[in-house]
Amino acid sequence: MTVYLRSLETAVPPTILVQPEARAVFAAQPGLTRLGSRLVNTCFDSAAIDTRHTAVEELTADSQAENPQFFDPATGLVLSPSTKIRNGIFATEATKLFIEAAQKALEACPGVDAPDITHLITVSCTGFFNPGPDYKIVRALGLNPAVQRYHLGFMGCYAAFPALRAAKSFCEADPDATVLVVCAELCSLHVRTSNDPDTIMGSALFADGAAAAIITARDIPGEPALLRLDHFETVLTPVGEDSMAWNIGDEGFEMVLGNYVPHIIDDHIIGALEPLLS
């Protein structure tokens, strides 16, 4: 049985963070050492990013927030809201992106209507709430209330792949299955000022957005499928556990992103790909 990815759509928050402006703010924080300031400039410049989308409107230079929680334009200080405050914003703003991306994926897939969705998989590692995004999507889009719902949480940025793999398995088990996969991350909720290289790298690289896909083995007339989902493989490397991590702290989630990660991938990528190519 052949399983296809029939549509793929994205959604981003409207606020745009300009990279040079963000770099200037983070480099000017009073707690930075000279080395920390140099790291900020290096990481932000070498990221090769011009703009990023953020759900935190007050992170922009022209913010007019009356009671700022993330950035105070009057003093130029990056603030440190609690994890509770950050997660509360996630519950509100992530819901919007989950729903928008899911709606766009449905609209981009002629022949598939909301009641046709049999399985819903949501993915995120930047916040939690319950009833969760799966529930919100069902209600907002009018999905069948009996739809099978699953959430992959806190697996990190690769979680879209096991989500697609699960969708493929559902479709192979049931030829009539149609799976909606929706991923959303609000990384900018967890920005902070620090001299720590991993934290600086996270603040320089990541942003906010969502993506949704519809996967099915059904024969649907109209536009050709975007992708055929043939085979998935996964492998754990013997090293790297301490080089990449994501932990919950008192002032947001804390990233570990060592500069050795590309070398680990380089050393093990061939072995990981061999089962796919054999």
Name each model feature, range by range.
Residues T95-A102, I265-D266, I270:
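Hydrophobic faces of stable alpha-helices that mediate helix-helix packing
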Residues T42-C43, A105, I137, L276:
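Residues within well-ordered alpha helices
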Residues T92, I99-D116, C125-G249:
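Acyl-thioester C-C bond-transforming condensing/cleaving domain
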Residues M1-I89, T178, C187, T193-D267, ...:
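Condensing-enzyme catalytic core mediating Claisen C-C bond formation in acyl metabolism
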